[in-house]
Amino acid sequence: MRPAVEADGAVGAGVDPARAPTVPIRPLRFRELLDEPFALIQAHIRALAALGACVLVLAVAVVLAVTGVVSHLTDGSDAGTAWAVVLATAVCLWSLRLVLRGATVAMALADFEGVGLGAGAALRRAAKHAGPLLLAQVMFSLTGIGVLVVGSLLIITYPLALIWLAHVRARRFVTEPVIIGEHAEFGAAVARSKHLVDGANWTIGGLWLTQRVIFTVLAVPLFGIPFYLSDFSGTHRWAVITLLVSGLLLVVTVSEIVEATSRAICYIDRRCAREGMDIRVPGDSR
């Protein structure tokens, strides 16, 4: 069995925490896997809100700056402005997810140690594993695009593609927690994730699909915020661009924080189920 605690950031039984973890270290039922991420988020709401707000504001500012430059260079061309918005938003969205996923996982894993990390400390801990996390995000994106493109060749096969994607996502669901918690490189982390998830592929796949439904429901009120503000800002081009980009990135920010927290919780759950990490051995000094 692997040691329950690593030198910098891993988690497990045998730790004498300064405070009890927000989520109990034991195997969890499906309902708990859905509910506990929100409990963990609530326990660190200030740090996560600060992290999300800073990343969101920076991403929106970059999109608007790039769009403004392109619009100026193309003399306000509608096509040029539209492409600038789409491409800049896509790049910032991808980068936002990378940063939030790493920092949120680091913060969640620290909670299991009884440590409360602030936004800055979580970013620094994630930055130590920037290479593997970046590679994991690249493969995450390519896998999703590949599966959905193949599945969408025929409209009737699209639901099957979503199920296939859920299975693929489940096998790699705890890759980022392994990278941060066990200081693993990308290849070793993927193999470790598949080992931990083995036997619970469809449970975690179902969790992933259920979260897509939850995120869709959450998107309605979140998108309502910029549309409400449009009553005051008007419908000028830049006001509309700002509100639409802000609304989209806000939805992604909230969704990514929830999903990243779920990844950390599933990592602990699977280590308990597969390795008995929640079992204390008398006289064990780990």
Regions found by a protein language model. Give the residues of each.
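Hydrophobic alpha-helical membrane segments
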Residues: M1-R286
